């Protein structure tokens, strides 16, 4: 399994960045290869969703995911359910530095 961790300081409030990432319905508007998002189930702090991805001439693929999030701690965990990969998990953490600046920690694990 491959792992990548990235940390960035961003000049935006942590809560605003969290809200952008958790708004998965909007992904097709700004992620070029994401053609459609389908929300299968939404609970208080969980979402079951399918992302449809098409890259160049490759047929569209569906990635099913279980997303857990905590609005108070500003964390998001995504667990892969189905699709063309063997495994995929992501973790987001948004830390407030001050009212206008935050630190994003993004961790992704995947296996083809």
Task: State each model region's role.
Residues 13, 42-45, 72, 97-101:
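Short strand-connecting beta-turns/loops that link adjacent beta-strands
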Residues 24-27, 49-53, 110:
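Conserved short hydrophobic patches within well-ordered secondary structure
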Residues 1, 30-32, 59-60, 85-87:
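Short solvent-exposed loop/turn micro-motifs enriched in small/polar/acidic residues
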Residues 6-8, 37-39, 53, 63-69, ...:
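Hydrophobic/aromatic beta-strand elements that line small-molecule binding cavities or substrate pockets
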Residues 38-82:
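Glycine-rich portal/gate segments that line the openings of hydrophobic small-molecule binding cavities
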Residues 1-46:
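Hydrophobic ligand-binding cavity/cleft-lining segments
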Residues 3-7, 46-48, 62-64, 75, ...:
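Intrinsic-disorder/low-complexity, polar/charged segments enriched in Ser/Thr/Lys/Arg/Asp/Glu/Gln
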Residues 79-112:
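Beta-strand/loop substructures that line and gate deep hydrophobic ligand-binding cavities in soluble
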């Amino acid at each position: 399994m491959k792992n990548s961790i990235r940390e960035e300081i961003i000049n935006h409030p942590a809560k605003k960045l969290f809200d952008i990432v958790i708004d998965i319905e909007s992904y097709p508007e700004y992620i070029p290869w994401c053609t459609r998002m389908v929300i299968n189930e939404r609970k208080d702090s969980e979402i079951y969703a399918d992302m449809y991805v098409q890259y160049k001439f490759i047929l569209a693929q569906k990635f099913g995911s279980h997303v857990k999030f905590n609005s108070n701690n500003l964390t998001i965990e995504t667990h892969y359910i189905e699709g063309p990969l063997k495994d995929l998990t992501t973790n987001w953490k948004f830390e407030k530095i001050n009212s206008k600046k935050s630190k994003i920690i993004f961790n992704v694990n995947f296996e083809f």
